[in-house]
Amino acid sequence: MSANELTSGDFTESGEPFKLFAEWLKEAEASEPNDPNAVALATVDEDGLPNVRMVLLKGFDDDGFVFYTNFESQKGREILGQRKAAMCFHWKSLRRQVRLRGPVEIVSDAEADAYFKTRARGSRIGAWASKQSRPLESRFALEKAVAEYTARYALGEIPRPAHWSGFRIRPTSIEFWKDQAFRLHDRIEFRRPSPVGAWEKVRMYP
């Protein structure tokens, strides 16, 4: 089945970007070989130099797109400094792409705590042991830190580190791209002046 056959109707007629994203993600979950929620996250440092890396989307709704990270990591520091970010989803099996960008807010402690509890125990230990984005003298040093925190939290719940939480991108732009023959692709961008503004839909040249 081709990507064009998967979605009923013409996606360019949609006026609801979050609903359209939900439909596309659901189809990606059925067709991508792994991690359909993987997304390229772009941030910029204090000199305006961009950095990009893959993260996993952990939730989305009409308020925005959520992912979790160490706030002392490179991306954490850059987002806290600029409070803006961009994402790009690419589903090769569907020949589709979604780009979005906008201001970023920190999720509530309750949201972060609830998600942290769902993580594998080893991942929760790792959140304590890893000084993310800092130089590491050896693999042994990391394994030693993991062993120390494993012993410290051998019994009971593992608390969420204060430096580990989530960010929510509240998009002011969401673009849906779909491959078409001869590079005459379909591109639809939804724009709004602020995260609470009304959406304007614009068809873009490919």
UniProtKB/Swiss-Prot annotation:
Record has Oxidoreductase as a keyword: yes
Protein residues bound to substrate: K58, Y115, R119, S123, R183, L184, H185
Function: Catalyzes the oxidation of either pyridoxine 5'-phosphate (PNP) or pyridoxamine 5'-phosphate (PMP) into pyridoxal 5'-phosphate (PLP).
This protein's record includes keyword Flavoprotein: yes
The enzyme's E.C. designation: 1.4.3.5
Pathway: Cofactor metabolism; pyridoxal 5'-phosphate salvage; pyridoxal 5'-phosphate from pyridoxamine 5'-phosphate: step 1/1; Cofactor metabolism; pyridoxal 5'-phosphate salvage; pyridoxal 5'-phosphate from pyridoxine 5'-phosphate: step 1/1
The protein, known as: Pyridoxine/pyridoxamine 5'-phosphate oxidase
Subunit note: Homodimer.
UniProt record similarity statement: Belongs to the pyridoxamine 5'-phosphate oxidase family.
Pfam families: PNP_phzG_C, PNPOx_N
